[in-house]
Amino acid sequence: MRAKPFLELGKVRIYNEDFLETEAIEPDSIDLTVTSPPYNVDIKYGSYDDGIPYDEYLEFSRKWLRKCHDLTKDDGRLCLNVPLDKNKGGAQSVFADLTIIAKEVGWKYYATVIWNEQNISRRTAWGSWMSASAPYVIAPVEVIVVLYKKSWEKTHEGISDIAEDELIEWTDGVWNFSGESKRRIGHPSPFPVELPKRCIKLFSYVGETVLDPFLGSGTTLIACLERGRAGIGVEINREYCKLAAKRVRNTGAQTKLEEVIGPLGSLTREETPRKR
């Protein structure tokens, strides 16, 4: 039985469910997924154990990546924001491992974007101080792995809202912008709206459907509203659903929702829509 949306606002919907169990999304209906799954670094989410054994984490990742693949159209894409690696609880090559699993369940690899978040958490660690005994290496970057289901090239025409300067800068492969403040957003691991905004404008047409299976504070749906995409967010934690709903409502009011949900409502005068 399909659950009712926690929030439905125009073409944006939030579901308070476990993504692995939800039946709210039709197979082969998603054009683009933009998400940052749990990192398994013991972040206190409230309703999810973010410190499980690594093999269990990889199996969990396999399940959700497979389901996401099933929900995606043949020319659909996935932008997967994950850490390059992790050191807490033992060094693990998260980016490499999840990329391998994604390919094993059917995703095809396209590219990797390096996100230089400029050390938002101000992390510092040295391990063995001034000694070769056991020094730590910290990567102050994350990655966005770009994958696709069957066809990288879109099989239909649509309207792109990306500007020329954005296209040139964003296809460079190294993105430099700051991370988001936990305190300001009220979520233990938010990403800035700049991240989904770039993915959405670069990899989807206006009016297409974007999914975030780990919605968190709702940032992906905010970008959907601002850029004229339909958006579906799934979040297991009810308190985070409330937070996401509040942020989405505020964004809807600020961007005049009745215009944004139209196919060209979010385009500025400076942007020239074009078919690709």
Predicted stretch roles:
Residues M1-L243, P273-R276:
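Core catalytic lobe of class I
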Residues A3-P5, E239, A253, V260-P263:
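Terminal low-complexity, poorly structured segments
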Residues N16-T22, V260-L267:
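Conserved SAM/SAH-binding loop
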Residues E157-D161, T255-G265:
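Short, flexible loop/turn segments with low-complexity composition
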Residues C241, A245-T255:
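C-terminal helical cap(s) of enzyme catalytic domains, especially alpha/beta-barrels
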